[in-house]
Amino acid sequence: MSTVYINIFLAFTMSLMGLLMYRSHLMSSLLCLEGMMLSLFIMMTVAILNNHFTLASMTPIILLVFAACEAALGLSLLVMVSNTYGTDYVQNLNLLQC
C-alpha cells in the first residue's frame, strides 16, 4: 500500500473520528462529513487513475455532485436551525423533547 493511499485513508479516518467525537454542534458535524466526502473522492480518483478503469471514470464526478447536494442541504438545515433555536446544538433537534 503506497503512502498516498495511507494518507487518504488517515484523512478519512480522522474525519470519521471527528464526526463521532464532535457531534454536539451541527456545523462541526457538517465539516467532518465534507472531509469524509473529499477524501473518498480523492481515493476513488487515485484508484481509478492507477488501475486505468475507463468505464468508472464518471464515478468521482457523481460523488462530487452528491457531496455538493449534501452540502447545500446541510447549510440550509444549519440556517433554519440557527434561526429557529438561536444555536446549532444537535441536542435541540430531539423530537421527543416536551
Swiss-Prot record:
Gene3D superfamilies: 1.10.287.3510. The keyword Transcription regulation does not apply. Its EC number is 7.1.1.2. GO terms for molecular function: NADH dehydrogenase (ubiquinone) activity. It is a multi-pass membrane protein. Its main location: mitochondrion. It comes from the Eukaryota. Keywords: Electron transport, Membrane, Mitochondrion, Mitochondrion inner membrane, NAD, Respiratory chain, Translocase, Transmembrane, Transmembrane helix, Transport, Ubiquinone. It catalyses: a ubiquinone + NADH + 5 H(+)(in) = a ubiquinol + NAD(+) + 4 H(+)(out). One of its GO terms (cellular component) is respiratory chain complex I. One of its GO terms (biological process) is ATP synthesis coupled electron transport. It is found in: Mitochondrion inner membrane. The chain crosses the membrane at residues 1-21, 29-49, 61-81. Core subunit of respiratory chain NADH dehydrogenase (Complex I) which is composed of 45 different subunits. Core subunit of the mitochondrial membrane respiratory chain NADH dehydrogenase (Complex I) which catalyzes electron transfer from NADH through the respiratory chain, using ubiquinone as an electron acceptor. Part of the enzyme membrane arm which is embedded in the lipid bilayer and involved in proton translocation. Belongs to the complex I subunit 4L family. This is NADH-ubiquinone oxidoreductase chain 4L. The lineage of its organism: Eukaryota, Metazoa, Chordata, Craniata, Vertebrata. The gene is MT-ND4L.
